[in-house]
Amino acid sequence: MNDLQLSAELALFLTKLPSEPGIYRMLDEEGTVLYVGKAANLKKRVNSYFSKQNTGVKTRALVSQIKSIEISVTRSETEALLLESNLIKALRPKYNVLLRDDKSYPYIHLSNHPDFPRVELYRSKKKPPSGNFFGPYPGVAAVRETIVTIQKIFKIRNCRDSYFKARSRPCLQYQIKRCTAPCVHYISPENYKLSVEDAIRFLQGKCQIILDELAERMKNAVSQLNFEEAAVLRDQIKNLRLIQEQQGVVQLRGDADVIAIEVRPGFACIQCVTIREGQVLNSQSFFPTVPYAVLDEELDANSLWQQTFEAFIGFYYLDTSERIPDLIITNQSITESRSLEYILSQRRGKSCKIQVNPRGVKSRWMDFAVNNLRISVAEYVSKHSTIRSRYQALRQLLALDKNIERMECFDISHTQGEATVASCVVFDTEGPRPSEYRRFNIEGITPGDDYAAMEQAVTRRFKRLIGAQLLPDVLIIDGGKGQVSIVKRVLTSLGVEDITLLGVSKGPSRKAGWEKLILVNENREFVLPEDSKALHLLQHIRDEAHRFAITAHRKKRQKTRVESTLESIEGVGAKRRQALLQRFGGLRELAKASLEEICKVQGISEQLAKRIYEHFHP
């Protein structure tokens, strides 16, 4: 044991630990989980934290806060790694390397429609729909670009099922040659299925297999004098070969993931390059939060590299075994490489190897990954140095004793009192946190009363935050002195203290740069110079709150108007309105429908159909 004074209870606990695989949770005196780890031998691993040889900065800081330890024994190392990964995602402990929840990264989803599957972007924490998923991708832009490529080459539909069912003629996607119009049966289910199978192979990186099959189908089409189909297949082959050239095809076959990692003070960057069928299919960057900002010892840097790699393995591979490749290539030796190989191979059902410092073609893959890693790190540092300097400028402006870790901003949006919505956006030291944004439908107030709307939104928000103990350091209100005073009254009534309340009011000309800042705690108002870093940060969060509010307001207003338009027709209630919208996909399509088409909707009589038709064709 080291010089840390352990309680008698904890010291006794350490002597009675089992020598079995499992996970351990280290807790502070308030019962908060500080760290979650896995072990092949719980007794050896947990006791190692209290050894004199363990002198790392992070370890000393962690051990000094441990009040108790909880363990869970598992049947195998594989089970331990899975449980560790799930607990880290759920608890987000302070001293673990934290990667963003896998479900918040976007995927490509191919639906399981029996005849004509749809391709779409999918990103949700809800239970996913059935079908095929591909990803995750580094961002929404990458997914959309890939979907457009799939539409151009394979002509897979991307419309919603309700819209698809309602079509009586091809849409614009058919006109611009991105869809084969299965909605009006311009293509048979059998031929559409071939296109879907090709799209799946494309997303799996099996371009050469597709090219061989397309070439054979083109040859058959020519022999049958079907030159129109042959021309379509020729264009597909041409586009696929162009993509192969852009991706850099190499001669080596096989699947591999190339992982390059760099750990810096405060963050780490993981560059994962996906190689399938010998070609670079994807390159994406991940930026986990490291558990300790000071890396002044070589032991800590190496330890964090290992921890980052293991965290990424759990995050990226263990939920989806289909993602595990034949080979994982890294830029640094792995302490537990044999153990990880065994776990991944078990999970996959066949061999997975980990290789360090490869040669030949594989070394070119690693060079590619490392070059992309350097670019990603440089971009991250540049972006976050700007964010940090802006946060520091705002802290100095507000004369705060501590760093600003979290800010929230509220805005109200409505059209002459109609469909009032309040938005709340959240920023932390990394920038915007979209997953924590909230919108509030405002009810029971006088239309157009912004003060009452703001009071209702802030009250609802902070009642929840008090329970979750997640209060912001700075609360920003997009509004004038009246709205800020209302919010101050709400906070006081809820017993919320130690929050800096700041109003951002548009100037007389409503021009950016002329905003008036209202600092309630000091009862003063002032205008910052246009080049102020603090002003730029406030403008950013204010504009984001406004964007989020107006988007939510427009959706609510459109929904309200559709409902009121249909329900103003005698005989159309909520159920029939829903049936009509589901059949036609929207109000505009319903207005274009013929009397005969409206009659086909379940629950709509001929007399009611005539009334609906006449409503749109007076």
Curated annotation (Swiss-Prot):
<dbReference type="InterPro" id="IPR001162">
    <property type="entry name" value="UvrC_RNase_H_dom"/>
</dbReference>
<dbReference type="InterPro" id="IPR010994">
    <property type="entry name" value="RuvA_2-like"/>
</dbReference>
<dbReference type="GO" id="GO:0003677">
    <property type="term" value="F:DNA binding"/>
</dbReference>
<dbReference type="GO" id="GO:0005737">
    <property type="term" value="C:cytoplasm"/>
</dbReference>
<keyword id="KW-0227">DNA damage</keyword>
<comment type="subunit">
    <text>Interacts with UvrB in an incision complex.</text>
</comment>
<dbReference type="InterPro" id="IPR000305">
    <property type="entry name" value="GIY-YIG_endonuc"/>
</dbReference>
<keyword id="KW-0228">DNA excision</keyword>
<dbReference type="Pfam" id="PF22920">
    <property type="entry name" value="UvrC_RNaseH"/>
</dbReference>
<keyword id="KW-0742">SOS response</keyword>
<dbReference type="GO" id="GO:0009432">
    <property type="term" value="P:SOS response"/>
</dbReference>
<dbReference type="InterPro" id="IPR035901">
    <property type="entry name" value="GIY-YIG_endonuc_sf"/>
</dbReference>
<dbReference type="GO" id="GO:0009381">
    <property type="term" value="F:excinuclease ABC activity"/>
</dbReference>
<dbReference type="Pfam" id="PF14520">
    <property type="entry name" value="HHH_5"/>
</dbReference>
<dbReference type="Pfam" id="PF02151">
    <property type="entry name" value="UVR"/>
</dbReference>
<dbReference type="InterPro" id="IPR050066">
    <property type="entry name" value="UvrABC_protein_C"/>
</dbReference>
<protein>
    <recommendedName>
        <fullName>UvrABC system protein C</fullName>
    </recommendedName>
</protein>
<keyword id="KW-0267">Excision nuclease</keyword>
<feature type="domain" description="GIY-YIG">
    <location>
        <begin position="19"/>
        <end position="97"/>
    </location>
</feature>
<comment type="function">
    <text>The UvrABC repair system catalyzes the recognition and processing of DNA lesions. UvrC both incises the 5' and 3' sides of the lesion. The N-terminal half is responsible for the 3' incision and the C-terminal half is responsible for the 5' incision.</text>
</comment>
<dbReference type="GO" id="GO:0009380">
    <property type="term" value="C:excinuclease repair complex"/>
</dbReference>
<keyword id="KW-0234">DNA repair</keyword>
<dbReference type="Pfam" id="PF08459">
    <property type="entry name" value="UvrC_RNaseH_dom"/>
</dbReference>
<dbReference type="InterPro" id="IPR001943">
    <property type="entry name" value="UVR_dom"/>
</dbReference>
<dbReference type="InterPro" id="IPR003583">
    <property type="entry name" value="Hlx-hairpin-Hlx_DNA-bd_motif"/>
</dbReference>
<feature type="domain" description="UVR">
    <location>
        <begin position="208"/>
        <end position="243"/>
    </location>
</feature>
<dbReference type="Pfam" id="PF01541">
    <property type="entry name" value="GIY-YIG"/>
</dbReference>
<dbReference type="InterPro" id="IPR038476">
    <property type="entry name" value="UvrC_RNase_H_dom_sf"/>
</dbReference>
<dbReference type="GO" id="GO:0006289">
    <property type="term" value="P:nucleotide-excision repair"/>
</dbReference>
<comment type="similarity">
    <text>Belongs to the UvrC family.</text>
</comment>
<dbReference type="InterPro" id="IPR047296">
    <property type="entry name" value="GIY-YIG_UvrC_Cho"/>
</dbReference>
<dbReference type="InterPro" id="IPR004791">
    <property type="entry name" value="UvrC"/>
</dbReference>
<keyword id="KW-0963">Cytoplasm</keyword>
<dbReference type="InterPro" id="IPR036876">
    <property type="entry name" value="UVR_dom_sf"/>
</dbReference>
